[in-house]
Amino acid sequence: MTWKTRRVYKHGVFCLEGDWWPDLKNPASVEPVLRLLSESHISRVPYIYRDVGTAEDFKYYLEKWTQTRYAEYPILYLGFHGVPGKIVVGDKRRKDSHVTLDNLEDWLSGSCAKRVIHFGSCETMNVSATRLQAFLKATGALALLGYRKIPEWIESAAFETLLLGELQYNAMSRSGLKTARERVKERLGGCQLLRELGFRMEIRE
């Protein structure tokens, strides 16, 4: 099937991003990836982007994402530093900056039908499949995406452009996501880059 004949769904991206470096003069951001996708003549992916500096702000925007008015933005992109099972929001020295899967599961309980969550963070997905499936069951989300390793910035940005773009050509369903996962592997010519990044897509059973 060629690009011209594939249906485009235009699944919007709701992106929350924290600071990557202590020096605020460093402009590093994932927004250029989203801007590129939004300006693509094929997909024109809509997106909402917010800078987040505190756990309080993070929870505020997380609740916004679950509202019906944002149903057209079913892809939640969380761009933060991470460790296994957690993301770090704001000053890592603060106890409340470590947002765990347990926290997210509690805040998003039953609110993620027909939605997916992408952790654009190091190692957050380096937990058991059993734990991820429990999260998916509790929240109703279709899938969790992210990394088990510490990916390089350029490689992950290039990969996420491909990943988010591919999601536009598949229904927001378990079967659609399985198709997207296989097509990403095919377009990368195998699984080597996926292994180097430690990428995984856990789809609800």
Which role fits each region the language model picked out?
Residues 92-157:
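Catalytic cores of nucleophile-dependent amide-cleaving enzymes
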Residues 1-73, 81, 89-92, 114, ...:
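A domain-level signal for caspase-like cysteine endopeptidase catalytic cores
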Residues 97-107, 170-205:
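Caspase-like cysteine protease fold
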Residues 79-84, 124:
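Short glycine-rich anion-binding loops that position phosphate/pyrophosphate groups of nucleotides
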Residues 157-169:
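Short, small-residue alpha-helix embedded
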Residues 33-41, 62-69, 104-108, 135-136, ...:
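Hydrophobic, Leu/Ile/Phe/Ala-enriched alpha-helical segments that form helix-helix packing faces
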Residues 53-59, 151-154, 202:
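A short acidic, often aromatic-flanked loop/helix-cap motif at beta-alpha or helix-coil junctions
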Residues 15, 77, 118, 144-146, ...:
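A structural signal for short, well-ordered beta-strand segments and their strand-loop junctions
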